[in-house]
A protein has these predicted regions:
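Short helix/strand-bridging catalytic loops that position acidic/His residues to coordinate divalent metals
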Residues: 99-107, 131-132
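Conserved N-terminal glycine/acidic-rich loop preference
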Residues: 163-196, 209-233
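Periplasmic c-type cytochrome electron-transfer domains
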Residues: 2-77, 82, 86, 93-94, ...
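Short, intrinsically disordered, charge-biased short linear motifs at domain edges
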Residues: 65-70, 193-199
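Periplasmic/extracellular electron-transfer cofactor-ligation site
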Residues: 73, 77-100, 126-129, 153-158, ...
Length: 285
């Protein structure tokens, strides 16, 4: 009997503690701050399991025809790339400020089944910024996007631009930000040393964790880019550029200068932010 009473008391204390935590507003809900690892895991696991469960009833039509994929590519560019990016194309600046960060769909296109992709695009996801397209696009358009998302992981930036029939799309805001950051620090001034603590904070704001596994930053469980653990001990950046502070700053600010057809897009990283991110990456040993 004592054990039962003790368990009841513990349960009541736990409920009261949880209620107090919520009521007092102790959890930081700002979009500039990352989720804790346990919260991120709960959110991600809940979302994934819900999609798998509810998408089972979706019947998948024939997918993968050339015209369907081409249509899906065009629709994806207009409606999806603003948040999720595209091969060699960055997300819009506003999307980098969403938390959780919109997923890079290169891995999603491989790991997720077509019925799961359709269900998610059709119904959207609460508390993620992912809208429901059910009443905004026709059903055949949604399936065309699904067909393209399945093709996306195998498409290079050069192929994407060529197949789209125009130059790499980039928002005027991002283009302006990139141009402005190029003249932020005059060559006559000695750049300030990087701040690794700020760098850890800033690296989240540019969505780097969507593609890379970064120690100390909560993000994608299955990153599509190389992990950045022990970056401070590596000899090269991207397998081709000597790993020095100045080279890392140059790489962060304009990666396509070194790999024109690489998947890593230009994000309009400012001089100061690049130096702080560099300082944090150099601390990873």
């Amino acid at each position: 009997m004592r054990v039962v009473v003790a368990l009841i008391v513990l349960a009541l204390v736990a409920v009261a503690g949880a209620a107090a935590f919520v009521y007092l507003g102790l959890y930081n809900i700002t979009a500039t701050d990352q989720h804790t690892a346990p919260v991120f895991w709960v959110l991600k696991t809940t979302m994934r399991r819900a999609v798998i469960t509810h998408a089972k009833a979706v019947k998948v039509p024939a997918l993968g025809g050339a015209s369907q994929v081409a249509r899906g590519r065009a629709l994806y560019t207009v409606h999806c790339a603003r948040c999720h990016g595209a091969p060699g194309v960055a997300s819009e600046p506003f999307a980098l400020g969403l938390r959780p960060s919109p997923a890079n769909l290169a891995n999603t296109g491989i790991e997720w089944k077509p019925n799961e992709l359709y269900w998610t695009i059709n119904h959207g996801l609460k508390l993620t910024g992912m809208p429901a397209w059910e009443f905004r696009l026709r059903d055949d358009a949604l399936w065309a996007i699904v067909a393209y998302v399945q093709r996306l992981p195998y498409e290079t930036p050069r192929e994407y631009r060529a197949l789209l029939g125009r130059e790499q799309p980039q928002s005027p805001q991002l283009a302006k930000a990139t141009k402005a950051s190029d003249v932020e620090t005059p060559d006559t001034l000695q750049p300030a040393p990087g701040d690794p603590d700020r760098g850890r904070f800033v690296i989240l704001q540019y969505g780097c964790v969507v593609c890379h596994d970064i120690p100390g930053v909560v993000g994608a469980a299955i990153p599509v880019g190389p992990p950045l653990a022990k970056m401070g001990m590596r000899s090269f950046i991207g397998g081709r550029l000597a790993n020095t502070s100045e080279n890392m700053v140059r790489w962060l600010r304009d990666p396509q200068q070194f790999v024109p057809d690489g998947a890593m897009p230009n994000l309009g990283v400012s001089e100061r932010d690049a130096r702080d991110i560099t300082a944090y990456l150099e601390s990873l040993k």
